Amino acid sequence: MSILDLFRWIQDTAPMTALRESALVYPIVMTGHLTGMALFGGMICITDMRLLGWAMRDTPVNDVIDQLRVWKQIGFVMVVGCGAMLLGSKAELYYYNPFYWTKMALLLLVGVHALAFRKVYANPAAFPSKAKVAACLSLFIWIGLVTAGRSIAYWDVPAELTPIYGSEGMTTHHTRK
């Protein structure tokens, strides 16, 4: 089974079809995804700005990280949960969307970044210059990720898929014919 076959199979399940065709549930899930991204991304941005010394200078870095941890976790669960539902509902369109794959590559890079700088984030005071590098890289990766994610909705369906989905592509609720 290819990735495309898997995406089509997921998309054609009853829950994903119902989600895709719902004029109420789909926007709620999208709102949950964007809210989770704002929460998760916002907490990361605050952490990075503190590591760079641009915000909350009077608060120790470890305190900022500890205080934001639960909010990051809530945002992460929202982003992943709602994102999986959004992917499943229009999986074939996402498969062909270059911005989706760019977003996935940047998500992978986020994971690599987190692993590479794990010791730095655990004790940023011990590695001040590395913490600043980690924060700069994090901000750039997340800006790219959010840009790619928002671009997904504005990608035009290629002509060869138009008979299947119509020219509206990602912006409409429909069933694959």
Regions found by a protein language model. Give the residues of each.
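Polytopic transmembrane helical bundles with strong interfacial aromatic enrichment
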Residues: 1-177
